[in-house]
């Protein structure tokens, strides 16, 4: 009897899960198969489309690298140290997830705009953010850094601090203990966070369109074509983005999975 109840429960859960999977998969499959290979190829040959896709990948990668350099040390401190205001900092890190991204764009414009303090300071160095690549990078960094920092923090929290203490008692420096013990053991979580952050940056639209409508990243180009020419003209661009992101994301996940198996 208990086995029968358990089987019914699993069957119900499977049906509910399948409904959710279909909800996500059907629109993606419908879009991916809506345009013929010839149309997709012609769209990919358009310089504007290629440039926007490459710019999207490049700026998201740069934002991820910046977050890696500054976010991993912050994650380590949050995982290993208790200090006044720690919960506040953790809350600040999570804020970009819940703030409407159009509001995030306005907030960044209030700091990095041409007439704002940081905007003027960087302008003296020849760096501008409004309608420029650095602005896109700043936006992607702001809206997606939470994924990397939180994943890295969870990775460091999973590493037993006694391992570091043992290394220190044997004469290892704090840097050596970090790079040789904590960082390698937390690497899988850090890599997962980097993949999620990079993927989130690729899809950003609301904040980017406020800071830097031009040069156009792929989501902005897709929006412009839909607004100007309708569904038929924008559909190939959407299909290309879905296919490229899907293939890239699967490849990165496979690489991460292989690293886990090798470590195991």
Protein language model regions, located:
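Membrane-water interface segments at the C-terminal ends of transmembrane alpha-helices
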Residues: 2-38, 47-157, 181, 185-205, ...
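Short coil/turn motifs that cap or connect alpha-helices
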Residues: 84, 173-174
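Short hydrophobic faces within alpha-helices
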Residues: 95, 163-170, 234
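Structured catalytic cores of enzymes that bind and process phosphorylated ligands/cofactors
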Residues: 99, 171-172
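Membrane-helix/interface signature in polytopic inner-membrane proteins
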Residues: 153-164, 174
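Hydrophobic positions on the alpha-helical face of helix-turn-helix-like DNA-binding modules
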Residues: 166-167, 177, 181, 222
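Glycine/proline-centered hinge or cleavage motifs at structural transition points of membrane proteins
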Residues: 170-171, 184
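Extracytoplasmic catalytic/substrate-binding loops of multi-pass membrane glycan-assembly enzymes
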Residues: 216-217
